[in-house]
Amino acid sequence: MKPAPFDLLRPPTLAAAVTMLAEAGAEARVLSGGQSLGPMLNLRIVQPRVLVQVNHLPALAGIAETPDAITLGACVTHAAIAAGRTPDLGDGWLARVAGVIAYQAVRNRGTIGGSLCHADPAADWVIVLTALDATVVLQSTAGIRRMKLPDFMVGPYATALVAGEILTAVSIPQRPAGATWRYAKACRKPGEFAHAMAALLIAGTTRRLVIGALGTTPVLLTGKQASLDGARAALAGLDAVDRHLQLTVVRRILQEADA
């Protein structure tokens, strides 16, 4: 398995990367950790003419914390988050998610931005950051725009990124004291993709329940619908076995949140 021929560009700055992407247009792909894009290249699922490598750019590895949000550059790795080298929410919420992504070798190279751009329906960050009401920051030669994840994820393996645009950061709102968060997934063995997964945020009057690994975009339930009954209704069209597994995961996190 070998990829189709391509040109590999290594821009010196983020501005240069954006210019390169604009010039190449739809024939370009961004290369960060390569943990998802690499296999797709080898299988020739994607055949870009140009790859723009960005994981060496300091502008995409930035980490910032304010009273309102934690902002992580797109090239911050899962391993850095799992090791506590970034700010976190609550009692290590983000570190616990990063620590169960695939295997250590993947966590060492894989990035939070790359995971979101790959938009796998069973990706941990896709589900968790939707529950946490995160915002992605996108940049192109036309400027910068910000987008909530439900708007960014337009389908399985599909995002709202346009040609020449790059995801530069993700901003995660801080949570008030007393906020509750739960996350669980069902895998055949550790490190594999989940067959069922759900994340829950309860912060004051806010309730957000996200169900993933459905083969589509995540299901987001809010308010009173962020409940077992709401999940039952939302998953009514699933195969009976898949629905049972998904509802088991949802029931688990709801029970843990109430404990």
Outline where the language-model segments fall.
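C-terminal structural segment of proteins
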Residues: 1-259
